[in-house]
Swiss-Prot record:
CDD domains on file: Pep_deformylase
Name used for this protein in its record: Peptide deformylase
EC class: hydrolase
Textual note on the cofactor: Binds 1 Fe(2+) ion.
Signal peptide residue numbers: none
Matches recorded under NCBIfam families: pept_deformyl (TIGR00079), PRK00150.1-3 (NF001159)
GO terms of molecular function: metal ion binding; peptide deformylase activity
Organism: Bartonella henselae (strain ATCC 49882 / DSM 28221 / CCUG 30454 / Houston 1) (Rochalimaea henselae)
GO biological process: co-translational protein modification; translation
Gene it is expressed from: def
Keyword terms of this UniProt record: Hydrolase, Iron, Metal-binding, Protein biosynthesis
Active-site residues, Swiss-Prot/TrEMBL: E137
EC number: 3.5.1.88
Function field: Removes the formyl group from the N-terminal Met of newly synthesized proteins. Requires at least a dipeptide for an efficient rate of reaction. N-terminal L-methionine is a prerequisite for activity but the enzyme has broad specificity at other positions.
Catalyzed reactions per annotation: N-terminal N-formyl-L-methionyl-[peptide] + H2O = N-terminal L-methionyl-[peptide] + formate
Length: 176
């Protein structure tokens, strides 16, 4: 299971809307395994396929703690059925926006219908951290990032910072 390179802001692919997975076959199974390996290696709790440059409606999650047994979820073609009115605030980060964290307010609970890695239609009701992670990753599938919930000033500052990093990286690579 090879790890896949992560797509980093300001890459425009992160703003694309992902397409549904048509068939769950061995290629999709392998993609799920690669995504999980990539997520665990990067020490993340979630990863959407678009974050490795694949615009498919697919994500992986594991909110278990380091001292707990792994409990990975593979979620294909998710559809949010309902969101609670009650809200939570969590400090969020993103593998596509490394080393940046900000508080984001989201619904505390939700219900999602999806296909699991075997293609079986499933529903999950989640709250707190799992609900937040599901919403964060589903946002990726719709071309939305957690920084979109911040003020325009903060969001623009983050994007400028990452554009500058990308420019410096490209300059260094050109020198080598």
């Amino acid at each position: 299971m090879p790890m896949r390179p992560l797509v980093i802001v300001p890459d425009p692919i992160l703003r694309e809307i992902s397409k549904p997975v048509e068939y769950i076959d061995s290629a999709v199974q392998k993609l799920a395994d690669d995504m999980l390996e990539t997520m665990y290696h990067a020490q993340g709790v979630g990863l959407a396929a678009i974050q490795i440059g694949i615009p498919l409606r697919m994500l992986v999650l594991d909110v278990s703690r380091n001292d707990e047994q792994k409990n990975p979820l593979v979620i294909i073609n998710p559809e949010v059925l309902w969101l609670s009115d009650e809200r939570n605030i969590y400090k969020e980060g993103c593998l596509s926006i490394p080393e940046y964290f900000a508080e984001v307010e989201r619904p505390k609970r939700l219900c999602v219908r999806y296909q699991n890695r075997e293609g079986k239609q499933t529903e999950i009701e989640a709250d707190d951290l799992l609900a937040t992670c599901l919403q964060h990753e589903i946002d990726h599938l719709n071309g939305r990032l957690f920084i979109d919930y911040l003020s325009k000033i903060k969001r623009d500052m983050v994007i400028r910072k990452f554009k500058k990093r990308a420019k410096e990286k490209n300059t260094q690579e050109a020198v080598l």
